């Protein structure tokens, strides 16, 4: 049960284990799932947020239903690379999930993925597809989750999660030392 970098997450997956991408918003959680070969991300749904416990139960059910073993969670880093309140909220949600393995029936693992501009990119694509505003509003969160997960899958296929890319390798306390506190705090 840990927060890992992307390559460690892949190494910990059981054979044919799937990943689920999350786009955590204030009102909804967009969900996407990978194929067993970790090549393609598909949008699968949205959870309307209520209370953490209910959100976590719905997420656990979605993971079990799709044989998902680990999560790639979009981290809304500021444009200058700093982490603001939204990142703190995402990290806290992830930390709380990891404290409840009984919900999942296994110990889930999480990797963060820099999601800067993911929703904007998805909205531009959907406008290009001539989707109505109403339809875009209905699917934007799960499409953003698929965009986030696909970026992570593409990185995994490259076999390189080196610092400087989009793979956020910071641990729970925001540094890269793998320990609680006392790290460099710098990330990449």
Curated annotation (Swiss-Prot):
Q: Where in the cell is it found?
A: Cytoplasm
Annotated InterPro entries:
RNaseH-like_sf, YqgF, YqgF/RNaseH-like_dom, YqgF/RNaseH-like_dom_sf
Q: Where does the record place the region Disordered?
A: 156-188
What domain of life does the native source organism fall in?
Bacteria
Keyword hit for Transport: no
Q: Which UniProt keywords apply?
A: Cytoplasm, Hydrolase, Nuclease, Ribosome biogenesis
Query: Biased-composition ranges for Acidic residues?
Result: 166-188
Provide the top EC class.
Answer: hydrolase
Q: Name one GO biological process term.
A: rRNA 5'-end processing
- EC numbers listed for it are 3.1.-.-
Keyword Cytoplasm in the entry? The reply is yes
GO terms (molecular function) for this protein are: nuclease activity
Which cellular component appears as one GO term in the record?
cytosol
UniProt-listed HAMAP family: Nuclease_YqgF
PANTHER family in UniProt: POLYNUCLEOTIDYL TRANSFERASE, RIBONUCLEASE H-LIKE SUPERFAMILY PROTEIN
Its biological function?
Could be a nuclease involved in processing of the 5'-end of pre-16S rRNA.
Family in the record: Belongs to the YqgF nuclease family.
Name of the featured protein: Putative pre-16S rRNA nuclease
Q: Which organism is it from?
A: Rhodospirillum centenum (strain ATCC 51521 / SW)
């Amino acid at each position: 049960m840990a927060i890992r970098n992307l390559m460690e997450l892949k190494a910990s997956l059981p054979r044919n284990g799937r990943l689920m991408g999350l786009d955590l918003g204030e009102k909804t959680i967009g969900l996407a799932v990978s194929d067993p070969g970790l090549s393609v991300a598909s949008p699968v749904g949205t959870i309307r947020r209520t209370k953490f416990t209910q959100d976590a139960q719905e997420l656990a059910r979605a993971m079990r239903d799709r044989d998902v073993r680990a999560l790639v969670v979009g981290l809304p880093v500021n444009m200058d690379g700093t982490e603001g309140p939204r990142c703190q909220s995402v990290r806290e949600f992830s930390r709380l999930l990891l404290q409840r393995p009984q919900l999942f029936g296994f110990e889930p693992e999480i990797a963060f993925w820099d999601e800067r501009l993911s929703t904007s990119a998805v909205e531009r694509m959907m406008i290009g597809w001539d989707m109505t505003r109403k339809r875009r509003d209905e699917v934007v969160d799960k499409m953003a989750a698929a965009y986030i997960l696909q970026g992570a899958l593409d990185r995994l296929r490259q076999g390189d999660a080196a610092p400087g890319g989009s793979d956020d390798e910071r641990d729970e306390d925001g540094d890269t030392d793998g320990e609680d506190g006392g790290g460099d705090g710098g990330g990449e």
